[in-house]
Amino acid sequence: MAAKLLFFLLFLVSALSVALAGFEEDNPIRSVTQRPDSIEPAILGVLGSCRHAFHFARFARRYGKSYGSEEEIKKRFGIFVENLAFIRSTNRKDLSYTLGINQFADLTWEEFRTNRLGAAQNCSATAHGNHRFVDGVLPVTRDWREQGIVSPVKDQGSCGSCWTFSTTGALEAAYTQLTGKSTSLSEQQLVDCASAFNNFGCNGGLPSQAFEYVKYNGGIDTEQTYPYLGVNGICNFKQENVGVKVIDSINITLGAEDELKHAVGLVRPVSVAFEVVKGFNLYKKGVYSSDTCGRDPMDVNHAVLAVGYGVEDGIPYWLIKNSWGTNWGDNGYFKMELGKNMCGVATCASYPIVAV
């Protein structure tokens, strides 16, 4: 029996080596892992030893996937193969960005949209913004991470709470810029407590409305005292745990990228929202653009934080912090084409003025 088991393990290692030998340098799977001991025997026992099965087993190991049945393994494998084909076909188009395998590669677009994106929000309240141009020379490029005021990338999990992470990201940056100290603020408080300001917890909301909530609430608690759970809950705000207060919130005029660039360039990071469409969930690097996403106030379905801008290969871009963890995109960040209000990135932009 032991001899048969040893033979089987040697066969798996040999087969994996053959599969790896055929990889192209730009294969989207290469970034997962190439160690033979990363193979999940349960997955290979169901799927066999074909090349895609090895790819899928390594993917599952890399991202800590757990499937409850053979049927689930087969289902997720089928989706994974479809996404892999989509990635390869997209990357062959020689676009300004590339896609790659990440933690969402075993989800259909519908599953991803349901679990990670909030409902579309109406941003028409920003039709006339209150951002004021201040004196100063606009930098050619900007990356607020270099100033040390951008907090670490977080992960919203399977909750459409992106708006809370965009909100706390802007507040954390403003706090650090003001005090020179870092902090982490409570997304869960916003999920649980901000519904009176037209926000809907895991079903979506807007940073501009969250800033107003924090202003009238008298502050937002720290992450340590009100930790993130990723589900709708009962409000448990405590005034003694407040980390930051909001004096006012500033809205960028709807669609005005010149205003947005001025704010990001000379003020600080700005909360923005845009429409995520199929393919963006598998973004890896480069300057993202799309001819299928919308730009209208009712199109936006995901809130993020613009932390800078620049030019890559002749294409101007926004540098944006996401809330899908550091395994996604470029260590949790992405670049979005600048100058076309791409996917509505300047449709729903705002930033807070804070106090301690």
Swiss-Prot record:
- According to the record, glycans are attached at N122, N251
Q: Name one Pfam family in it.
A: Inhibitor_I29
Which GO terms fall under molecular function for this chain's record? Answer: cysteine-type peptidase activity; feruloyl-CoA hydratase/lyase activity; identical protein binding; protein homodimerization activity
Q: Where in the cell is it found?
A: Plastid, Chloroplast
Can you tell me which residues form the catalytic site? C162, H302, N322
What InterPro entries does this protein's entry cite? Answer: Papain-like_cys_pep_sf, Pept_asp_AS, Pept_cys_AS, Pept_his_AS, Peptidase_C1A, Peptidase_C1A_C, Peptidase_C1A_papain-like, Prot_inhib_I29
Q: What do the Gene Ontology cellular component annotations say?
A: chloroplast; phenyloplast
Question: Which reaction is catalysed here?
Answer: (E)-ferulate + H2O = vanillin + acetate; 4-O-beta-D-glucosyl-trans-ferulate + H2O = 4-O-beta-D-glucosyl-vanillin + acetate
UniProt xrefs under Gene3D superfamilies: Cysteine proteinases (3.90.70.10)
Record's keyword annotation contains Zinc: no
Pathway(s): Aromatic compound metabolism; phenylpropanoid biosynthesis
What is the tissue specificity?
Answer: Accumulates in the inner part of vanilla pods (at protein level). Expressed in single cells located a few cell layers from the inner epidermis.
Q: Which UniProt keywords apply?
A: Chloroplast, Disulfide bond, Glycoprotein, Lyase, Plastid, Transit peptide
Q: For this protein, what is the EC number? A: 4.1.2.65
Q: Which PROSITE patterns match?
A: THIOL_PROTEASE_ASN, THIOL_PROTEASE_CYS, THIOL_PROTEASE_HIS
The processes (GO biological process) annotated in the record are: phenylpropanoid biosynthetic process; proteolysis; vanillin biosynthetic process
Please tell me whether the keyword Metal-binding is annotated for this protein: no
Cysteines engaged in disulfide bonds, as pairs: C159-C202, C193-C235, C293-C343
Which applications in biotech or industry are described for the protein in this UniProt record? Heterologous expression of VAN in yeast leads to the production of vanillin and vanillin glucoside flavors at low cost.
Q: What does this protein do?
A: Involved in the biosynthesis of vanillin (4-hydroxy-3-methoxy-benzaldehyde) and derivative natural products, key components of vanilla pods flavor. Catalyzes the double carbon bond cleavage of ferulic acid to vanillin and of their respective glucosides via a coupled non-oxidative hydratase/lyase reaction. Inactive toward p-coumaric acid, caffeic acid and their glucosides derivatives.
**What's the subunit arrangement here?**
Forms homodimers, homotrimers and homotetramers.
The record's family statement is: Belongs to the peptidase C1 family.
Q: What is this protein called?
A: Vanillin synthase, chloroplastic
Output the lineage of the source organism.
Answer: Eukaryota, Viridiplantae, Streptophyta, Embryophyta, Tracheophyta
